[in-house]
A protein has these predicted regions:
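Beta-propeller blade termini and top-face loops
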Residues: 1-134
Length: 134
């Protein structure tokens, strides 16, 4: 993920996982704009295969307006994650939801009530079996 502080004139890469991983979702805490959450997705597609997830997929948090990032994955599945959608509760910004695509045993909707300190699985289902739908 790239960040600009001068209206887009200059950019700095602030969250670089690997060449197969990008940021697919980012949300900002409306009560504290220094706090951001980003979902990364590792995928690899070539003529022989499509891998919908990998070790680069995760959720990250910044507490300094996106200058630095750290992974917040306690309680999330340990298998390779697929695409992730993230939402902050409009009533309480310490509550965050993550819809995570992965295998049927581990994928689903996860919730944190402590700003990403730990996650609890709330649902076994995200969407149909035809790919990410967030």
């Amino acid at each position: 993920m790239f960040r600009s502080i001068d209206g887009g004139k200059n950019w700095k890469n602030v969250l670089d996982i690997n060449k197969w991983t990008g940021v697919t979702d980012i949300v900002i805490d409306k009560n504290d704009p220094n706090i951001l959450y980003a979902a990364t997705w590792q995928r690899h597609r070539n003529v022989a295969a499509y891998m919908g997830g990998g070790p680069g997929s995760s959720i990250y948090k910044s507490i300094d307006s996106g200058i630095s990032w750290f992974k917040i994955d306690v309680g999330l599945p340990e298998s390779n994650l697929g695409k992730i959608g993230v939402a902050i509760s409009p009533c309480d910004s310490s509550i965050i939801y993550a819809a995570i695509e992965t295998d049927r045993r581990n994928g689903g909707v996860y919730k944190t009530t402590n700003s990403g300190g730990s996650w609890v699985k709330m649902s076994d289902t995200v969407s149909g079996a035809t790919g990410p739908h967030y």
